[in-house]
Swiss-Prot record:
Recorded coiled-coil stretches: 16-55
GO biological process assignments: protein transport; vacuolar transport
Family named by the database record: Belongs to the SNF7 family.
Subcellular location field: Cytoplasm, Cytosol; Late endosome membrane
InterPro entries recorded: Snf7_fam (IPR005024)
Topology of the protein relative to the lipid bilayer: Peripheral membrane protein
Encoding gene, per UniProt annotation: chmp2b
Name of the featured protein: Charged multivesicular body protein 2b
Motif (MIT-interacting motif): 202-212
Primary location class: cytoplasm
Region (Disordered): 178-203
Compositional bias ranges of the Polar residues kind: 189-199
């Protein structure tokens, strides 16, 4: 019983109208089919009367045929009109659905705008930007400090590696030359032998410069 007194929605009304239009279209199609059948019968009667030489009967039947064909033409016009109405109904239904969707969206936007405070939102964004800049500055300072520490450590390690390399090379050369030097039991080497077996300061300095150590 509740459904009998329920208020019809726009969709319900449009659905009923489309149903009626479809019924009207089917009725027009049936009427046209009947007219076409009657048209063929009249044509056969006219031919029959013409063969019999009955001109008056042919004249009367011809007038009926003209009226019937006019009526059949009207059915096409009415059918076209019904189709147009059905199309318009569908367009209206689509437009009303779009309007309903826009109305719902507008209400949602209105509710959101009521909850939002533009001034407060702007202040929040400004605070975020300010704190973000502070964080970036702090991060940059920390990175610079760490870079300085590690760069200095790397420089010291690199310098020490170079010095060790030079000393190793010098040690290898000294060992090689001292292996050829005479032992203490055979007496001290002469001045010329000492000069040839040892490494001069100039040679050490030259090797250091070659490795980039000042």
């Amino acid at each position: 019983m509740a459904s009998l007194f329920k208020k019809k929605t726009v969709d319900d009304i449009i659905r009923e109208q489309n149903k009626e239009l479809r019924g009207t279209q089917r009725a027009i199609t049936r009427d046209r089919a009947a007219l076409e059948k009657q048209e063929k019968q009249l044509e056969m009667e006219i031919k029959k009367m013409a063969k019999a030489g009955n001109k008056d009967a042919c004249r009367v039947l011809a007038k009926q045929l003209v009226q019937l064909r006019k009526q059949k033409t009207r059915t096409y016009a009415v059918s076209s009109k019904v189709t147009s109405m059905s199309t318009q109904t569908k367009v209206m239904s689509s437009q009303m659905k779009m309007a309903g969707a826009m109305s719902t969206t507008a209400k949602t936007m209105q509710a959101v705008n009521k909850k939002m405070d533009p001034q407060k939102t702007l202040q929040t964004m400004q605070n975020f930007q300010k704190e973000n800049m502070k964080m970036e500055m702090t991060e940059e300072m920390i990175n610079d400090t760490l870079d300085d520490i590690f760069d200095a450590s790397d420089d010291e390690e690199e310098s020490q590696d170079i010095v060790n390399q030079v000393l190793d090379e010098i040690g290898i050369e000294i060992s090689g030359k001292m292996a050829k030097a005479p032992s203490a039991a055979k007496g001290l080497p002469s001045t010329s032998a000492s000069k040839s077996s040892g490494i001069s300061d100039e040679e050490i300095e030259r090797q250091l410069k070659a490795l980039g150590v000042d």
